[in-house]
């Protein structure tokens, strides 16, 4: 019962966040300087892909933040060269309250956000929508309201992801 109420509260907060995202001015970007990647645990091992993506746009590794979303209670910590934060459903409070310990992270503004997941789930969408990003890129099977650019490809196809994002994002920048 508590999980159902928590899910309902998170769904309401997600709705508020989606409204906020849709009303944001997108403005003209000339260059991306910061990158946020929100991914499921199954895609968290793609550090090389994320670094290659950032390199295409001249984003320094120090300006990359990865958020890994998991259903597990206990997460294995993996040492990476990219700033990485792990979230579980327990990280989010009962009424969809985000962790106080990561308040600064949620206040930070990102130039580009990649929603590197291809499914629709309230927890994933809520965390993704909680960040302040100028431009959001995602995949076709997730909530389209989350993203400004939607790629109809499989996230497991790394080379295709690099090619497609390079094509479309460079067109947006020019």
Predicted regions and their residues:
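Short N-terminal or domain-adjacent regulatory/targeting segments
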Residues: 2-34, 41-44
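Short, charged/polar "capping" segments at the starts of alpha-helices
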Residues: 44-46, 72-77, 146
